Swiss-Prot record:
Record comment regarding domains: Members of the RBR family are atypical E3 ligases. They interact with the E2 conjugating enzyme UBE2L3 and function like HECT-type E3 enzymes: they bind E2s via the first RING domain, but require an obligate trans-thiolation step during the ubiquitin transfer, requiring a conserved cysteine residue in the second RING domain.
Gene: dbl4
Species of origin: Schizosaccharomyces pombe (strain 972 / ATCC 24843) (Fission yeast)
Zinc finger residue extent: RING-type: 131-178, 291-320
Residue sites binding Zn(2+) 3 per the record: 217, 222, 244, 246
Family the UniProt entry places it in: Belongs to the RBR family.
Protein name: E3 ubiquitin-protein ligase dbl4
Length: 504
């Protein structure tokens, strides 16, 4: 990236290093074409719950960036620095850039901080003067960007280093009132090699961060990005799950781990609810009741059944929830369970408790599959040892015992899917579509438990070949049940069949 704006760098041809990471999907190659961002995109027939995406390397990102700048400089008479500044200001939206620039070229350049021509080469010069930052005087090395605001070289370098350390890739002139962006050529003249390398990595990141169709893989130390053209507006009808070359699977829309079949808006609501409710929900359910008048949660801290709500001062009976005025002097016993006022209060509380019990039903199953998925991760180590032992006990090669690891892989995927089916089901309105969804959910859950049990128990009751065939058959079946559930849910999202109890 150090030669980002050199002509030779722009003209250099890169091999197509785009790698397909959709190894978990059944797909068929068709003709390839070039998209608007310069990436090679292969059109494929995919499952209903899959989306088109590409994994791109830093090398490809830089090639695409250079190509975009080259294309625009051939249309409008600007330097590469100015085109780069415009692109970054308009978030790499070519159409919006051209529209605004054609309508108001000078204003667009000024807002982008590249209004001044960058054709003049900036050099460090020595002369008598005073630095306006440190106020050193004498014959000093001075430097200025395209705006000609001059400061001593040491201060300029320190200023750039501090901005880069703060993660900034668009750096304005040190002059307080100046909006001019310091060009890449100018920064190259001032910084040492180590600082320049950090700056160029920031440029790479900004290209992805500012582009709606690109997202960095969230895996630690992974340098791949994902290119996907699913828009934010469509996230209520599609779950754009992608898989990086490093193996990380995540949602392109929100960046969370794969949460199919639940759409991103529901994921956000569910996670917030879990954070707010789950830690205390069980305790509340067991130890508290709600005021029949204002519904404030109340904990009983003594033996007396005469309760007074601290919030609204309403007096009621802890046992039957009726007004205390109807209880006379029977402070520690209650025989008025069938009174109309008590029944009404209990009905109100019953609805509230039913809502809490419904939430706990879905949350407990959500949490159970999350815990099971973590245990399946531990199963990998056990599986590796078991695969090694299989080779010792038979004449199978390492490739031939991969069926066991593949089974654990699909188990983990299905646990993740099942976990999120409960979040999705919690927000579904009850109708025929919900019944079908729960049938598919039940079938997948049963298939997963059968495969999990088979993988964990020793194969003492049958030969290795029979055991292998059983695992292969159940793995295929589990994968097919997952596809059925996800495909049906995805089609329902696309067709608008799902109805929710919350607004999304």
């Amino acid at each position: 990236m150090s030669d980002l704006l050199d002509d030779e760098f722009y003209e250099e041809e890169f091999e197509n290093d785009l790698l397909d990471a959709s190894e978990f999907e059944d797909e068929f190659d068709e003709d390839a074409e070039i998209d608007d961002d310069g990436f090679t995109v292969e059109r494929k027939r995919r499952r209903a719950h899959s989306v088109s995406y590409r994994v791109v390397s830093v090398r490809d990102l830089r090639a695409s960036l250079n190509e975009k700048i080259n294309q625009l400089t051939s249309i409008i008479d600007l330097t590469r620095e100015q085109v780069l500044g415009l692109y970054r200001y308009f978030k790499w939206n070519r159409e919006r850039l051209l529209e605004r620039y054609i309508d108001a070229p000078e204003e667009s350049l000024q807002k982008a901080g590249v209004g001044l021509s960058g054709s003049k080469q900036r050099e460090v010069v020595h002369h008598e003067g005073t630095c306006e930052i440190c106020y050193d005087e004498g014959c000093l090395p001075f430097f200025s960007a395209e705006c000609d605001h001059e400061f001593c070289l040491a201060c300029y370098r320190q200023y750039l280093d501090s901005r880069i350390s703060e993660g900034e890739s668009v750096i304005q002139c040190p002059e307080e009132s100046c909006t001019q962006i310091v060009s890449i050529q100018s920064i190259t003249k001032v910084l040492d090699e180590k600082s320049l390398d950090r700056y160029h990595r920031l440029l790479d990141r900004s290209f992805v961060d500012d582009n709606d169709h690109l997202r960095w893989c969230p895996a630690p130390d992974c340098e791949f990005a994902i290119e996907c053209h699913v828009t934010q507006a469509s996230l209520s009808s599609v779950v754009p799950t992608v898989t990086c070359n490093c193996g990380k699977q995540f949602c392109f829309g929100c960046g969370h781990d794969n949460h199919q079949p639940t759409i991103c808006p529901l994921v956000k609501i569910w996670l917030q609810k879990c954070q707010d409710d789950s830690e205390t929900a069980n305790w509340i359910h067991a130890n508290t009741k709600e005021c029949p008048k204002c519904s404030t949660t109340i904990e009983k801290n003594g033996g007396c059944n005469h309760m007074t709500c601290k919030k609204c001062k309403y007096e009621f009976c802890w046992v039957c929830l009726g007004p205390w005025t109807e209880h006379g002097n029977n402070w520690y016993t209650c025989n008025r369970y069938e009174e109309k006022s008590s029944t009404s209060a209990r009905d109100s509380q019953s609805k509230s408790r039913a809502s809490l019990e419904r939430y706990l039903h879905y949350y407990n199953r959500f949490a159970n599959h999350e815990q099971s998925a973590k245990l399946d991760h531990e199963l990998y180590e056990h599986t590796h040892k078991r695969m090694t032992q299989m080779q010792v006990d038979s004449n199978l090669s390492w490739v031939e015992v991969q069926f066991l690891k593949n089974a654990v892989d699909i188990l983990f995927q299905c646990r993740q899917t099942l976990k999120w089916t409960y979040a999705f089901a919690y927000y579904l309105a009850r109708n025929n579509q919900t019944e079908i969804f729960e049938d598919n959910q039940r079938d997948l859950e049963l298939a997963v438990e059968n495969l999990s049990e088979l993988c964990e128990r020793p194969c003492q009751d049958c030969s290795l070949s029979v055991f292998k065939q059983r695992v292969l058959d159940k793995t295929v079946y589990v994968r097919s049940r997952r596809d059925v559930l996800l495909d049906d849910t995805a089609r329902g999202l696309a067709e608008g069949r799902w109805e929710y109890v919350v607004d999304v």
